[in-house]
Amino acid sequence: PVHVLGNMCDMDRLKALARQYNLTVIEDSTEALGSYYKGKHSGGFGLMGTFSYNGNKIITTGGGGMIVTNDEVLAKKAKHLTTQAKSDPFEYIHDEIGYNYRLVNVAAAMGVAQMELLPGFIKRKHEVMDFYKKELTGVGDIRFQEVSKDVNANCWLPTIMTEKQKE
């Protein structure tokens, strides 16, 4: 699933469907860093979760991202492929087609430092959302994205909806 704008999918339903049809769950949690479903963090429900640190995300390193998994074999494979698939760290021997998806150390350090500040970033996102709700509730037919009672959303981007379109 893709968790959109800080909100999370109904993971119980999705996991039930995955079991029924023998599917693997891989979460795109790019917009849901810091969001929870029934007390469990986004990205932790399937075989793997992915997060982006692009410039417009709640935490940014200017680019790059993170893969999370509890599967040790998959974690090693991901690390191997994202570090150019070198079979020897000192020689230029590649046993598969790999890519250079490593964050440079400075960018990684920025991400780690911001991770410690994530609760404060999310608190501020909630304050902004509360402001918009206070100021825009009752204006025309504006309504806000609904968040399931089971979700603690990070409010990544305030989202409003309306039936009317201005041409």
Named regions from a protein language model:
Residues P1-V2, N7-R13, Q20, Y36, ...:
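PLP-dependent aminotransferase class I/II
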Residues P1-T61, M66-V68, V73:
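Active-site phosphate-binding strand-loop segment of PLP-dependent enzymes
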